[in-house]
Amino acid sequence: MEAGTEVGKLARELFGKPVDVTETVNGQLNLPAMTDRTQVEIEHETSVICEASFSYQGCYCAVDILKRENDGWAIYEVKSSTVNEKNMKAVYVADVAYQKYVLEHCGVRITGTYIVSINNDYVYDGKLDLERLFQITDVSEFVRNEIGEVEKNLLQEDTLLESENEPERELDYTVKIHMDVRIGNIVQKNYQLRPYLTYIGCR
């Protein structure tokens, strides 16, 4: 976790001076405050927002780096490992597709989706070169193919969350990811935060 946090901080430096909207209360992430602050930064035309937070019908996500473009916004998902075709398709693209799904349902136009990962060919020569340490992969085509699966997975998760029984088979990894997020939302609700967050017209 610490290594991932440090990589995330370094990756942010590729984008100048972004605004981090992370908010906490009693040591826990304050999701309503984060979504509210994200809206404020968007209205203030902030160029780059870190941990940009959105919620749509109980689905919450925080984008590692959200960068303003001429006609919309680009999602940058930071990974502390290298990217290969297998993990990109099986795990990373699913994450980004979920984020795009939530943001677009919140009225945010997404014009690009990227994964920022470690370049395993980089050799440290005594001076850190972030441009060479990281590689940025455009995953727009993969996300476009994956986006249709998001809603199907959410329907499956709704069934599982409402059931009193354990699932009969092991969950697909993508479903596990989304379940963790949505169970986290339930915990947040019990933390006396607003049960349904709203953002740019989401209900």
Regions of interest found by a model, annotated:
Residues 9-13, 94-104, 148, 152-155, ...:
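A broad, structural surface signal
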Residues 1-72, 196-203:
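Metal-dependent nuclease catalytic cores that hydrolyze phosphodiester bonds in DNA/RNA
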Residues 20-21, 107-114, 156-168:
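Short secondary-structure capping/junction motifs at helix and strand boundaries
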Residues 24-26, 30, 82, 89, ...:
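Alpha-helix initiation/capping motif
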Residues 1, 7, 129-203:
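Cys/His-rich finger/ribbon microdomains and the adjacent scaffold used
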Residues 37-145:
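Mg2+/Mn2+-dependent nuclease catalytic core
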